[in-house]
């Protein structure tokens, strides 16, 4: 089993538990150059809010899109968009990534912006 398969297995297990609980999820995906965050409905079929470093709005605010500063901007923006749609509480789905570095910074920024998890 390689590193990617192990991460996907961890993510699948966590998503199964969140789906059983019927929780709205804040899903994070990271690549070496970008980070993506989506708020997904409990049934898993609808994206309610999203933000990523691919967006022009965020690219204008940060110097480089693959660092912690960019992750903080994405976390704040996705939280603001979720709160604007009336979503206040979510379950944090880290997609099998370690809760460390950019993933942790994104989560902290979303919490500071008012999202509860």
UniProtKB/Swiss-Prot annotation:
Protein name in UniProt: Large ribosomal subunit protein uL18
Role played: This is one of the proteins that bind and probably mediate the attachment of the 5S RNA into the large ribosomal subunit, where it forms part of the central protuberance.
Recorded family membership: Belongs to the universal ribosomal protein uL18 family.
One GO MF term: 5S rRNA binding
CDD domains attached to this UniProt entry: Ribosomal_L18_L5e
Subunit structure: Part of the 50S ribosomal subunit; part of the 5S rRNA/L5/L18/L25 subcomplex. Contacts the 5S and 23S rRNAs.
Classification via InterPro entries: Ribosomal_uL18_bac-type, Ribosomal_uL18_bac/euk
One GO CC term, this protein: cytosolic large ribosomal subunit
């Amino acid at each position: 089993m390689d590193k990617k398969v192990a991460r996907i297995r961890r993510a699948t297990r966590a998503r199964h538990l969140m789906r059983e609980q019927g929780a709205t999820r804040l899903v994070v995906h990271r690549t070496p150059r970008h980070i993506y965050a989506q708020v997904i409905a409990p049934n898993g079929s609808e994206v309610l809010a999203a933000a990523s470093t691919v967006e022009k709005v965020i690219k204008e605010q940060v110097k480089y899109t693959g660092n912690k500063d960019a992750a903080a901007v994405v976390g704040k923006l996705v939280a603001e968009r979720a709160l604007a749609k009336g979503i206040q509480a979510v379950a944090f789905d880290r997609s099998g990534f370690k809760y460390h570095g950019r993933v942790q910074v994104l989560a902290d920024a979303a919490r500071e912006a008012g999202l509860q998890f």
